[in-house]
A protein has these predicted regions:
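Non-catalytic surface loops within mature trypsin-like serine protease
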Residues: 66, 133, 217, 263-265
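Rossmann-like AdoMet
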Residues: 5-88, 92-99, 119
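Short, solvent-exposed coil/turn elements at secondary-structure transition points
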Residues: 54, 67, 164, 247-249, ...
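Residue-level signal for secondary-structure boundary sites
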Residues: 70, 221, 267-269
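Ordered hydrophobic segments in well-structured contexts
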Residues: 45-47, 61, 210, 258-262
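The AdoMet/dcAdoMet-binding core of the Class I SAM-like
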Residues: 79-212, 216, 220-231, 237, ...
Length: 276
């Protein structure tokens, strides 16, 4: 009786497993038939597909494990321009404070911001850190990274490593602008959302350096405490802290909120909320 039950369980488990595999393979076939490139990377199922923005301009998107990580224009004349508003704000701040400086971007994805900086700044050094070599390969194949490297007017260095480890090992006072996109999306800011992380950021920046971070959360409701918590942490280390909400008129909508922390007196983007 026990043996019979075992084989019954084994057979039905096998059938169920094969059914799941079959459904998954069918799902992949449907996506590929619709022009979606599907693969697996370090952090899960990864999809690349083309679409259009609100102005009907063709764009390409990178989605990793259900979270959009990057977006790029497809047209050759637009490939190194920025699609999203918070990236454009970041670029303006960087051009303001360090047009020929050392910029470190934590998190690669499709390398939208590093590509833009490398092709719009002259004489600067941009370090773009991505932990997953496969994501770097996808950026080269689908997001025009090699094209940007070929025409860059600044030194764009691609570093395949853990961004937090690279930051910890950086020389003190060696970075003009530090951009944190590593923990954007559904994850918290990890070590960089703590007091110890803020201290490391302060140590690695030049005296009037700037820290920029994408803090994805709503302004009100569930999950909204993240933004104020991170702002408070950095307010203990920097003279000036502000954030620019993506969706100020719909505060319960999760958005890419731009956090700015610095000891310098800089011109803040329009719509900035001053914390300190």
């Amino acid at each position: 009786m026990v043996l019979h039950d075992f084989w019954t369980f084994f057979i039905w488990s096998t059938v169920a497993g094969l059914a799941v595999i079959g459904i998954y393979q069918l799902f992949l076939l449907i996506l590929r038939a619709r022009g979606v490139f599907v693969t697996r990377t370090k952090f899960g199922l990864t999809m690349i597909f083309d679409s259009e923005d609100a102005d009907s301009t063709p764009i390409r998107l990178l989605n990793v494990n259900g979270t959009f990580q990057s977006v790029s224009y497809i047209a050759p004349e637009l490939r190194f321009e920025l699609c999203v508003h918070y990236h454009r704000m970041m670029a303006k701040v960087i051009q303001q404070v360090a047009p020929e400086g050392h910029v470190v971007v934590m998190g690669g994805g499709g390398f939208s911001l590093p590509k833009h900086l490398a092709t719009h700044m002259s004489g600067g050094v941009i370090d773009a850190i991505e932990i997953d070599p496969k994501i770097v390969s996808l950026a080269r194949e689908h997001f025009f990274l090699d094209e940007a490297l070929a025409v860059a007017s600044s030194n764009l260095r691609i570093i395949e490593d853990d961004a937090w480890k690279v930051l910890q090992n950086a020389d003190a006072g060696s970075i003009d602008v530090l951009v944190n996109e590593v923990f954007a999306g559904r994850k918290s800011l990890g070590p960089l959302g703590t007091a110890a992380g803020a201290q490391v950021v302060k140590e690695k920046l030049v005296p009037e350096g700037v820290y920029l971070a994408d803090v994805r959360c709503p302004l009100e409701g569930r999950g909204s405490a993240l933004l104020s918590q991170v702002a408070d942490v950095f307010a203990h280390e920097f003279a000036h802290v502000a954030y620019v909400p993506e969706w100020p008129d719909t505060p319960k909508t999760p958005g890419n909120n731009l956090l700015i922390a610095t000891d310098a007196d800089i011109a803040l983007p329009e719509g900035a909320v001053v914390v300190k």
